[in-house]
Regions:
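Hydrophobic alpha-helical membrane segments
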Residues: 1-248
Length: 248
C-alpha cells in the first residue's frame, strides 16, 4: 500500500543517518539541475512617459551589439543542452544509485555518484535523452500531458541506477508500467513539499541545501523502492532486469 508518510519518515531517517554525504550529493545534483531557487527582488519600471521614438533609437543603437551576441548566445544554448545530456543526466543516475544504496544498506558511498559515467555510459545517455525528448514532445500538446508523462517516466533514472545495461526501450516501458496507477500519488508526493519550497525561498536557497533537497531525494528513493516491489509482485519485471543494489 502506498504510504507517503512512511516514505517521508524513512527518507528523512536515511538522510539524517548520512547527513553530510546526502547534503553534498544533493548540492551537486541541485547545481547541475538548477534545483535551487533564489528569490530576487522584483524591479518595476515606470513607463508612463515612454517615448516610442526613443525606444526605436535605443534599439538601433544596440542592434550591432545584439548581432555580435547572437552567435555567442546560440553557442551557449547548445553548450547547455550538451552539458545536460552528457553530464547532468548520467550524474542524476549516479546520484540515484547513491540514494538507493544508502536506503538499502543504511550506509553512504559517495563514490557511487560516478556510476552513470562508468557503466554503459552510452546507454544511460541515450535512455535519459529519449525520456527528456518524449516529455518535451508531450508538453507541446498541453502542459498537463507533459506533467503526466513526466511522472510516467519517474522511475527511469532509478531503473538505470539499478541496471544501466537495460535496453532503452525496455527501461522507458518498464517505468510507464511501474507508475501506472501511481502518477497521482507521485504528484501528491511532490506537492507535499510545497511548503518547504516556500520556506526555501525565504532562506534564499539555504534551507534547500541543508534540509529540503536531501529530504526530497530520500523520499523519492523510498517511493521508487515501493514501485519496484509492486512491479515484482505484479510480475511486471524480474531479477534479471532489476538485480538490486548488490550488483555493480
Amino acid at each position: 500500500m502506498w504510504d507517503l508518510d512512511s516514505f517521508k519518515a524513512t527518507g528523512k531517517a536515511n538522510f539524517k543517518a548520512s547527513y553530510w554525504p546526502f547534503v553534498g550529493v544533493s548540492l551537486l545534483l541541485g547545481i547541475l539541475t538548477g534545483a535551487f531557487y533564489v528569490d530576487t527582488p522584483e524591479i518595476t519600471y515606470h513607463v508612463e512617459n515612454l517615448n516610442i521614438d526613443s525606444v526605436e533609437q535605443f534599439y538601433y543603437t544596440v542592434e550591432p551589439f545584439l548581432n555580435l551576441l547572437a552567435p555567442a548566445a546560440l553557442l551557449s544554448g547548445l553548450g547547455g543542452i550538451a552539458l545536460h545530456l552528457l553530464v547532468t543526466n548520467p550524474f542524476e543516475v549516479g546520484t540515484n544509485r547513491f540514494f538507493l544504496e544508502s536506503t538499502t544498506f543504511h550506509k553512504a558511498d559517495v563514490g557511487r555518484i560516478g556510476m552513470g559515467f562508468s557503466v554503459n555510459y552510452g546507454n544511460v545517455v541515450l535512455t535519459q535523452f529519449l525520456k527528456n525528448l518524449f516529455i518535451f514532445l508531450w508538453s507541446l500538446l498541453f502542459l498537463v500531458p507533459g506533467i503526466v508523462r513526466a511522472f510516467g517516466y519517474f522511475a527511469v533514472p532509478y531503473i538505470l541506477a539499478e541496471n544501466p545495461n537495460l535496453d532503452h526501450d525496455r527501461a522507458l516501458t518498464l517505468s510507464r508500467e511501474m507508475t501506472m496507477g501511481y502518477k497521482g500519488d507521485l504528484f501528491i508526493l511532490e506537492f507535499s513539499f510545497l511548503g518547504w519550497y516556500l520556506l526555501n525561498c525565504l532562506t534564499l536557497g539555504i534551507l534547500g541545501i541543508f534540509y529540503v533537497n536531501p529530504y526530497l531525494y530520500g523520499t523519492r528513493a523510498e517511493a521508487y523502492r515501493f514501485l519496484r516491489a509492486k512491479a515484482f509482485e505484479n510480475g511486471i519485471t524480474n531479477p534479471m532486469e532489476l538485480p538490486g543494489m548488490g550488483t555493480l
